């Protein structure tokens, strides 16, 4: 199913963040953060609103530059070559005001020109084959998110970042996206996924990072995270209480 995906993510692990801060205009968002992501599979990032989750993912993807500190992939500092092996899906994806298929072929032309058949195959995988000629900007929220994921898969990433890609989507779209991500992970793609949905994290995560006020308070396997939270803040978050 994922024969066109790059399966070399293991060479980019571990991902290490060393003493990273992000302090634009003296607004401290990430503070002296140290983190190592060793595992393959799906890593979920959780935390309250404004905790720095999206900023952390953008730092990992190279969309933002740390004020200080270092980010490495497999002992190599984050660079353009590594970024070419990454893709990102945002909560509100930006799509071309063209057809669904044109959105795919445009992305395909940027990278390896894998061909029209692959574009159509990936659209079918995401349940979008009947929308090939449909204007992308007129799709439903769930369909737009599936198209964004299809474009990301077309890039053949070793590491795929997703920033709340299923927020406010219908259950069928959520189920399909989760299924695709599990299959991609099984094919060797490292998934780093932001969500507020505790049940979703239980379904898909291999390990969970909990961040609050720009600091990682916990990074454990999913079963430990939910059964034996290591910090008061984590336990309060899981109980639906926000500790300010």
Describe these PLM feature segments.
Residues 135-139, 143:
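Conserved ABC ATPase signature
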């Amino acid at each position: 199913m994922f024969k066109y995906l790059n399966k070399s993510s293991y060479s980019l692990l571990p991902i290490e963040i060393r003493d990273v801060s992000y302090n634009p205009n003296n607004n401290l968002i990430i503070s002296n953060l140290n983190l190592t992501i060793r595992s393959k599979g799906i890593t979920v990032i959780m935390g309250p609103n404004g905790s720095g989750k999206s900023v952390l993912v953008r730092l990992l993807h190279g969309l933002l530059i740390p004020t200080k500190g270092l980010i490495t992939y497999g002992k190599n500092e984050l660079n353009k070559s590594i970024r070419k092996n990454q893709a990102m899906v945002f909560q509100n994806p930006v799509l071309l005001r063209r057809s669904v298929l044109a959105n795919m072929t445009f992305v395909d032309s940027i990278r390896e020109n894998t061909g029209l058949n692959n574009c159509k195959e990936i659209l079918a995988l995401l349940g979008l084959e009947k929308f090939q000629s449909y204007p992308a900007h007129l799709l439903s929220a769930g369909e737009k998110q599936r198209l964004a994921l299809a474009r990301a898969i077309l890039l053949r990433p070793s590491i795929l970042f997703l920033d709340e890609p299923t927020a406010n989507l219908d259950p069928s779209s959520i189920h399909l996206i989760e299924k695709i991500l599990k299959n991609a992970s099984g094919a060797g793609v490292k998934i780093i996924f932001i969500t507020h949905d505790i049940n979703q994290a239980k379904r898909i995560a291999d390990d969970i990072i909990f961040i609050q006020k720009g600091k990682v308070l916990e990074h454990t396997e999913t079963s430990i995270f939910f059964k034996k939270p290591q910090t008061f803040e984590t336990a309060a978050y899981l109980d639906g209480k926000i500790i300010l």
